[in-house]
């Protein structure tokens, strides 16, 4: 795995790349075009594989939930945009993706995967990296899974909601926090209000 240029609390590495858009058209997109919104940017190893369609379809199916909280989802792999389109046009019952609500970026030169530190150099594919980027373009969260295990859309949504809550209110979110749950005031005395309610 390459070390990359992606660091928590720093600007996410910008990129320009060709993507297959939800309307099935090819378009060059830039990460910086999404400034003003949160972005969930995730890598997957390859098109026409086994775990990948389950993740991509899961994120696509729930894209509207993310849009409601001002967050866009972008997927990426080292495959060409032509390969992405062929996979989208393959029926789900045959391992395809079907109609997508999210763009799929083509990183054939592996530059983006290297910049984000997810390139599996010996195979030339990306690990399952997931990056949450805030509306200012700052990287807030990084997770990288080994190839055989998929990610949780619920956990991704929870994390975006938690970062947005802390951005807005200045309070911090404890383990397992969900919208509506108690938060902690980041102050030695005021935090006792939260801890006094614990069993």
Curated annotation (Swiss-Prot):
Catalytic residues identified in the record: 52
Ranges of residues in domain Thioredoxin: 6-165
Modifications made to the protein after synthesis: The enzyme can be inactivated by further oxidation of the cysteine sulfenic acid (C(P)-SOH) to sulphinic acid (C(P)-SO2H) instead of its condensation to a disulfide bond. It can be reactivated by forming a transient disulfide bond with sulfiredoxin SRXN1, which reduces the cysteine sulfinic acid in an ATP- and Mg-dependent manner.
Stored Pfam families: 1-cysPrx_C, AhpC-TSA
UniProt keyword Ribonucleoprotein, yes or no: no
One of the GO biological process terms: leukocyte activation
PROSITE patterns from the UniProt entry: THIOREDOXIN_2
PANTHER family: PEROXIREDOXIN-1 (PTHR10681:SF111), THIOREDOXIN PEROXIDASE (PTHR10681)
Anything else known: Reduced levels of PRDX1 by RNAi cause the loss of motor neurons but did not alter the number of motor neuron progenitors or the dorsal-ventral pattering of spinal progenitors, and did not compromise motor neuron survival.
Protein name: Peroxiredoxin-1
């Amino acid at each position: 795995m390459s070390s990359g240029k992606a660091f928590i609390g720093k600007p996410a590495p910008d990129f320009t790349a060709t993507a297959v858009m939800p309307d099935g058209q090819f378009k060059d997109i830039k990460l910086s075009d999404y400034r003003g919104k949160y972005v969930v940017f995730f890598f997957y190893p390859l098109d026409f594989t086994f775990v990948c369609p389950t993740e991509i379809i899961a994120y696509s199916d729930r894209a509207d939930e993310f849009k409601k909280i001002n967050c866009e989802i972008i997927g990426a792999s080292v495959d060409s945009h032509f390969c992405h389109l062929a996979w989208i046009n393959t029926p789900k019952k045959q391992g395809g993706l079907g109609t997508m609500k999210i763009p799929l970026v083509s990183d054939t030169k592996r530059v983006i995967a290297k910049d984000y530190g997810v390139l599996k150099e010996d195979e030339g594919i990306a690990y399952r990296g997931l990056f949450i980027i805030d509306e200012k373009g700052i990287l807030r969260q990084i997770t990288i899974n080994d190839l055989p295990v998929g990610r949780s859309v619920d956990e991704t949504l929870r994390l975006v909601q938690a970062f947005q809550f802390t951005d807005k209110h200045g309070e911090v979110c404890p383990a397992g926090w969900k919208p509506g749950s108690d938060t902690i005031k980041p102050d030695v005395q005021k935090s006792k209000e939260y801890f006094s309610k614990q069993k």
